[in-house]
Amino acid sequence: MAKQLSTARKFKMITGKDLFQQQKAMDTELKKEDGEITDLMEFVQYGLYLALFQDNIVKAKSDFSDFRSSFEFDTDGKGLKELVELWQKEI
């Protein structure tokens, strides 16, 4: 089997943020009564989608950059829960 980058490493290369730290931040925000969770959830959802399904890191970074300015993204109908479950199979 050929060597490959982990999903967490690809996520960091694409978004500039650590996936585990982003997951912790999401958990923290969910516990707050007035937590701001939408931006964080979309950040993780789209970053994780790109890390899992876009093999071209340069294109993934470009797509993520576009998302950061427009807040529009397409995950082919895959929700955050499904993406996290796919990633957790790797851990």
Swiss-Prot record:
GO terms for biological process: viral tail assembly. Gene3D superfamilies: Uncharacterised protein, phage p2 ORF12. The keyword Membrane does not apply. Induction: Expressed in the late phase of the viral replicative cycle. Keywords: Late protein, Viral release from host cell, Viral tail assembly. It comes from the Viruses. InterPro entries: Gp12 (IPR048803), Gp12_sf (IPR043077). Probable chaperone for the tape measure protein. Might help to maintain the tape measure protein in solution during tail assembly. Homohexamer. Further self-assembles as a spiral. Belongs to the skunalikevirus chaperone protein gp12 family. This is Chaperone protein gp12. It comes from Lactococcus phage p2.
